[in-house]
């Protein structure tokens, strides 16, 4: 059923906020086009990972090719490129959108437009995609279809007068969505020449066949035996197989302009394939690559250590396997005096970090412990050298620092209007600046904030959700680096610095953070036979201190009455013993203490 007429091809993706019904709508489209037999159907069919099904989110971009006979009697090839909806995966979304000519915007009739769908719609509009608004879950009691129509028009600026109402769960109105795709989404453009240009929008590692590259052919054709070249990495390969997703892989003779599918070329190293790269032929290369390619760099860093030191090799293998399918994950080996050997990992954002942690524990059964997440700070030293630091252990000598800069982000926050005061307080507490407040409708506001990235990577989302009873949403994009007073807060246990507890903080928050950590450690470190001071210090100055009391032993218990000097002698002896013990004694910090300190937060 491999028809090739450019006018009969439609490439589109679905944009939606988490839980607005994107994967369910994809399921209904697969059913309606008979792409998947009814017996093979399961919920969220395109979300392969258990984690995706459980969290109800899409992490990888999954394409699928469907064939559909329209009301005009013609058969169309419809390619759906499913995109991740979360802010951490914005670059993956932008590459998936670059492979499309149109996008369906799915909005929940009960919740209305949310921050992350707004961000992705802007990405689609920048690419000049045709956007088809669809209002989902119209059969819910809380559905307000007219209100949501007005919101789409006011907030996003799209004409929603003919937005389709549907219920992806029951299948109501889904046929109308398919017909609208045929009429509203334009077919792929005629290529200007026959040179091969194929956009890489995702890849997947297969243990037996190497890297499977997901591509959209823009011009030319790619078939088995083609000798190809990756334009960004300059690597050459021979194509062993090309095919389409229906939604399982199905080999085909060739992929032609406008088509979406996969390519296998015996690529053994995943880093040879970059998302956003252009594939061309070695013999007749395209003069220029497709626009928009950029190398993604991690934003948030954290140390990962195995709780059981013998599992270090297992952790190395686990991270290596995850990196095969997740090119944005950055890994370096490091060691800590408190935690032993582990890895310093870089992530695109906090959700990305959580997903990696959860996959290590779930898929590889390794219990891990992580240090507090950190961002990249820029230090300008007296000799003009600029140093980037993401780990408190690499903090430069304070006497040589001329200037410190930290990353700031631009943040869009959507909230019900009654929570404005509480969110403003949260913004102030996080050192944020509100630059704009817009009214979306009678009940909701859109706030634009500038915030330091360091302040939002730990608990900003949790606090936003708890203040707004779950109705607030936010997304952010990198803005710029700005000078800031970032200092190293050192935590000492029994006068010894413990690197795993130390962190980089803003000067205004150092004291309160130090107090919180010290108070937490007093609760979780067990009593010793001698007094243990716990201190938070900046440079040489102690800003917070707590003391773990010593276990007291009654050395005079065996003295019945008698002379006081006898008791004094025993007390003095005990005092000397404790002093000596304090000098040579080591404090064992239990593993749970590290977990608790991470939760100590602000």
Curated annotation (Swiss-Prot):
Name this protein carries in UniProt: Elongation factor 4
Role: Required for accurate and efficient protein synthesis under certain stress conditions. May act as a fidelity factor of the translation reaction, by catalyzing a one-codon backward translocation of tRNAs on improperly translocated ribosomes. Back-translocation proceeds from a post-translocation (POST) complex to a pre-translocation (PRE) complex, thus giving elongation factor G a second chance to translocate the tRNAs correctly. Binds to ribosomes in a GTP-dependent manner.
Species annotation: Protochlamydia amoebophila (strain UWE25)
Positions of disulphide bridges: none
Entry similarity comment: Belongs to the TRAFAC class translation factor GTPase superfamily. Classic translation factor GTPase family. LepA subfamily.
Reactions catalysed: GTP + H2O = GDP + phosphate + H(+)
Signal peptide, first to last residue: none
GO biological process: positive regulation of translation
Domain tr-type G stretches: 7-189
Listed InterPro entries: EF-4 (IPR006297), EFG_III/V (IPR035647), EFG_V-like (IPR000640), EFTu-like_2 (IPR004161), LepA_C_sf (IPR038363), LepA_CTD (IPR013842), LepA_IV (IPR035654), P-loop_NTPase (IPR027417)
Annotated binding of GTP, by residue: 19-24, 136-139
PANTHER family named among the record's database cross-references: TRANSLATION FACTOR GUF1 HOMOLOG, CHLOROPLASTIC (PTHR43512:SF4), TRANSLATION FACTOR GUF1-RELATED (PTHR43512)
GO cellular component assignments: plasma membrane
Keyword Membrane: yes
Main localisation: membrane
């Amino acid at each position: 059923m491999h028809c090739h007429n450019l006018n009969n091809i439609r490439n589109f993706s679905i944009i939606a906020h988490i839980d607005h019904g994107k994967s369910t709508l994809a399921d209904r489209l697969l059913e309606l086009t008979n792409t998947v037999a009814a017996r093979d159907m399961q919920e969220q069919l395109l979300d392969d990972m258990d984690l995706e099904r459980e969290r109800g989110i899409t992490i990888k971009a999954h394409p699928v090719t469907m064939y559909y006979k329209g009301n005009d009697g013609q058969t169309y090839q419809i390619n759906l490129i499913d995109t991740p909806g979360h802010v951490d995966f914005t670059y993956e979304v932008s590459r998936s959108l670059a492979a499309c000519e149109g996008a369906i915007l799915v909005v929940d009739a009960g919740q209305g437009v949310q921050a992350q769908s707004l961000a992705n719609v802007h990405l689609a509009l920048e690419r000049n995609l045709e956007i088809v608004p669809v209002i989902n879950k119209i059969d819910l009691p809380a559905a307000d279809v007219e209100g949501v129509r007005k919101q789409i028009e006011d907030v996003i600026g799209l004409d929603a007068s003919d937005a389709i109402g549907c219920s992806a769960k029951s299948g109501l109105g889904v046929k109308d969505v398919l017909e609208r795709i045929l009429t509203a989404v334009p077919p792929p453009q005629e290529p200007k020449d026959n040179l091969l240009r194929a956009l890489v929008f995702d890849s997947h590692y297969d243990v037996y066949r190497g890297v499977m590259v997901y591509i959209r052919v823009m011009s030319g054709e790619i078939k088995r035996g083609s000798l190809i070249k990756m334009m960004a990495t300059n690597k050459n390969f021979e194509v062993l197989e090309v095919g389409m997703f229906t939604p399982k892989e199905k080999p085909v003779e060739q992929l032609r302009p406008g088509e979406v599918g996969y390519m296998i070329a015996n690529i053994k190293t995943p880093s040879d394939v970059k998302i956003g790269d252009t594939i061309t032929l070695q013999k007749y290369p395209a003069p220029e690559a497709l626009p928009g390619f950029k190398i993604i760099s991690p934003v948030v860093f954290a140390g990962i250590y195995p709780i059981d030191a013998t599992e270090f090799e297992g952790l190395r293998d686990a991270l290596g396997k995850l990196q095969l399918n997740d090119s944005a994950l950055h890994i370096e080996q490091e060691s800590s005096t408190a935690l032993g050997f582990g890895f310093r990992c870089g992530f695109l954002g906090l959700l990305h970090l959580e997903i990696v942690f959860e996959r290590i524990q779930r898929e590889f059964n390794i219990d891990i412990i992580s240090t507090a997440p950190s961002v990249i700070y820029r230090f300008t030293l007296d000799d003009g050298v600029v140093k980037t630091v993401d780990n408190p252990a690499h903090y430069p000598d304070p006497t040589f620092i001329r200037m410190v800069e930290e990353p700031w982000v631009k943040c869009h926050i959507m909230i019900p209007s009654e929570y404005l005061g509480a969110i403003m307080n949260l913004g102030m507490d996080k050192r944020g600046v509100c630059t704009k407040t817009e009214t979306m409708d009678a009940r909701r506001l859109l706030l634009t904030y500038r915030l330091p990235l360091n302040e939002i990577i730990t608990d900003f989302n949790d606090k936003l959700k708890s203040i707004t009873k779950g109705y607030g949403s936010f997304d952010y994009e990198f803005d710029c680096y700005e000078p800031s007073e970032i200092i190293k807060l050192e935590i000492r246990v029994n006068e010894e610095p413990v690197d795993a507890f130390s962190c980089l903080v803003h000067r205004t928050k150092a004291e309160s953070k130090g107090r919180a950590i010290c108070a937490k450690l007093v609760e979780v470190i067990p009593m010793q036979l001698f007094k243990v001071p716990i201190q938070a210090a900046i440079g040489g100055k102690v800003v917070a201190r707590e003391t773990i009391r010593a276990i007291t032993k009654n050395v005079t218990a065996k003295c019945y009455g008698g002379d006081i000097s006898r008791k004094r002698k025993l007390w003095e002896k005990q005092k000397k013993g404790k002093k000596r013990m304090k000098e040579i004694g080591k404090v064992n910090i239990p593993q749970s203490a590290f977990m608790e300190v991470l939760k100590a937060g602000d």
